[in-house]
C-alpha cells in the first residue's frame, strides 16, 4: 500500500493488519531530489528525520516497509546513499528506486542501479542478496520499456509497470510490453497467451485508449495490407510453416501471445493479398474476380 512517509499514513495499516490478520506492506515514499527539496523547503536533515520517525514506527508495529525514494533519478548520489543507508539501518529490507518524472535513459538506469547495489547497500553493511531492489519507471520520454529492460539487466529484483502504461501524465512503464520483451529475450518463460485479453479488459474497464498501432495488442499490430509483405507471409503459410509466417515480417511472433497474422486488402496490396483474403473468407477464387478487385 503506497503511503507517505508519515506516522499518520502508516497507522491505518496497523489497524488493517490486526483486523484482517495479514501483512500489508507500507510502500513509504519520500522525495529526495534537489528540485523537490527546494520546492518544499526541505533539507537532508528534515528528510532523514521524517524517514526515521515513520520507518521506525512501522517496524516497531510489525508493518513491513518498502522504502521508496521519489525522483531518485534526479537526486544527488550522496543524498541517495545517506537516506537509503539510514532506512536499511532501521530494518528496511526492500527499497524502490524511482524515475518519477520519466527523466532517465537506459544508460542512467544501469549506472544508478550499479551505484546502489555495489556501493550503497554494501557500504551500509548489508549483503545485496538480502535486500530486495525494486525499479519504478515512467513514460515521459517514451523510455519506460527500455528502462525496465535496463533495470532487469542491471540486477533489479522487481520491475514495476501498469497495463497499457496507465498512469499520471504520459503514464507508467507498460507492463504488457515489458513482459513481451522479457519473454523474447528468453529470461521469462511464462505463458502470455492471456495477456491480450487482460489488456483488452483494462482498455474496456478503465476507458484508456488502445491505439490500433499499439505494439503487440493494437488491432493493427500483426496486420499487413502491403503486397510484398503479405506475399511473403502467404508463402510461409502455404508451406504450412506457421513459425516462419509469424516471423518473416514481424519482430514479435503473434501466436506466442494468443494472436495471429492478419492479411488485409488495401491500396498497396498485391494479388496475393486478394487471393488469400478470398480463400479465407469463403469466396470462390477466379481470375476475373481477382483482377476486378485488384483494379478497383
Predicted feature residues:
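Conserved beta-strand edge residues that scaffold enzyme active sites
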Residues: 72-73, 101, 140, 165-166, ...
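A mid-to-C-terminal "edge-of-domain" accessory segment
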Residues: 188-296
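Residue-level marker of alpha-helix boundaries and capping positions
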Residues: 45, 74, 138-139, 189, ...
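A glycine-rich helix N-cap at a beta->alpha junction
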Residues: 1-2
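Alpha/beta enzyme core
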Residues: 7-133, 149-154
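Catalytic alpha/beta core domains of metabolic enzymes, predominantly
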Residues: 104-106, 111-239
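Generic structural signal for well-ordered, non-membrane alpha-helical segments
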Residues: 6, 10, 44-51, 80, ...
Amino acid at each position: 500500500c503506497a503511503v507517505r512517509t508519515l506516522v499518520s499514513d502508516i497507522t491505518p495499516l496497523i489497524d488493517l493488519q490486526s483486523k484482517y490478520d495479514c501483512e500489508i506492506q507500507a510502500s513509504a515514499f519520500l522525495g529526495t531530489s534537489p528540485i523537490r527539496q527546494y520546492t518544499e523547503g526541505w533539507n537532508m536533515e528534515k528528510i532523514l528525520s521524517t524517514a526515521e520517525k515513520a520507518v521506525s514506527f512501522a517496524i516497531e508495529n510489525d508493518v513491513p516497509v518498502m522504502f521508496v525514494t521519489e525522483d531518485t533519478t534526479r537526486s544527488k548520489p550522496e543524498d541517495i546513499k545517506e537516506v537509503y543507508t539510514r532506512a536499511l539501518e532501521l530494518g528496511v529490507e526492500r527499497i524502490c528506486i524511482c524515475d518519477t518524472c520519466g527523466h532517465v535513459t537506459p544508460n542512467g538506469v544501469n549506472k544508478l542501479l550499479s551505484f546502489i547495489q555495489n556501493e550503497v547497500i554494501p557500504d551500509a553493511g548489508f549483503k545485496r542478496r538480502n535486500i530486495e531492489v525494486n525499479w519504478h519507471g515512467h513514460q515521459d520520454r517514451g523510455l519506460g520499456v527500455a528502462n525496465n529492460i535496463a533495470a532487469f539487466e542491471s540486477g533489479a529484483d522487481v520491475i514495476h509497470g501498469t497495463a497499457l502504461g496507465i498512469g499520471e501524465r504520459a503514464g507508467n512503464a507498460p507492463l504488457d510490453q515489458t513482459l513481451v520483451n522479457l519473454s523474447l529475450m528468453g529470461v521469462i518463460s511464462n505463458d502470455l497467451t492471456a495477456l491480450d485479453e487482460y489488456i483488452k479488459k483494462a482498455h474496456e474497464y478503465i476507458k484508456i485508449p488502445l491505439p490500433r498501432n499499439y505494439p503487440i495488442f493494437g488491432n493493427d499490430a500483426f496486420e499487413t495490407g502491403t503486397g510484398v509483405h503479405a506475399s511473403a507471409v502467404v508463402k510461409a503459410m502455404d508451406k504450412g510453416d506457421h513459425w516462419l509466417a509469424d516471423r518473416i515480417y514481424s519482430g514479435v511472433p503473434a501466436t506466442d501471445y494468443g494472436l495471429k497474422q492478419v492479411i488485409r486488402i488495401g491500396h498497396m496490396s498485391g494479388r496475393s493479398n486478394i487471393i488469400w483474403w478470398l480463400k479465407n473468407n469463403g469466396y470462390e477464387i477466379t481470375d476475373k474476380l481477382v483482377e476486378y478487385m485488384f483494379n478497383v
